[in-house]
């Protein structure tokens, strides 16, 4: 039979809690405005991958701990807003414009597509309490971590491009 493309998350109905990760992948029919249903008051993690109709997401005030977004198939920057303190981990793949996230209590893992431009990563993030990993990046542009001052765990940079972290004091 034929199943139409999902265009919104109304199918979640009155779902109130996801104790694990809500994983949304290959939902090509979803488009803006994209929002977490207001009935969903407990959400430990959100993973979004391969959803070309979704280019921005505001997670402020949702209480989501772990955030994972794969935007690697788009050359546009994904606009992600989250609380100033992210209680869990942050995993990003692609180019992003970030708001909030001054402190991430868990790990941060970032993968980037190839680009020749210089990219500011984590433009607001001052502290990563867990491990910080910048992985697979063959870009010829530079990578800036403009305000990152401390990493609580291991700091792993698997990149070819020059990395600047002018305020980094503690690893």
Residue ranges with predicted function:
Residues 1-31, 35-55, 59-82, 86-100, ...:
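Concave beta-strand-loop units of leucine-rich repeat
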């Amino acid at each position: 039979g034929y199943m139409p493309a999902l265009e919104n998350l109304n199918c979640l109905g009155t779902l109130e809690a996801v104790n694990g990760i809500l994983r949304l992948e290959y939902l090509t029919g979803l488009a803006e405005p994209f929002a977490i249903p207001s009935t969903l008051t407990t959400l430990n993690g959100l993973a979004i991958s391969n959803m070309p109709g979704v280019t921005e997401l505001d997670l402020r005030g949702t209480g989501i701990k772990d955030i994972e977004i794969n935007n690697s198939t788009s050359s546009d920057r994904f606009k992600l807003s989250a609380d100033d303190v992210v209680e869990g981990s942050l995993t990003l793949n692609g180019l992003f414009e970030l708001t909030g996230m001054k402190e991430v209590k868990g790990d941060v893992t970032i993968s980037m597509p190839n680009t020749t431009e210089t990219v500011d990563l984590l433009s607001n993030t001052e502290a990563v309490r867990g491990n910080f990993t910048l992985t697979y990046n063959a870009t010829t542009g530079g990578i800036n971590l403009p305000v990152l001052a401390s990493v609580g765990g291991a700091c792993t940079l698997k990149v070819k491009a020059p990395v600047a972290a002018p305020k980094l004091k503690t690893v």
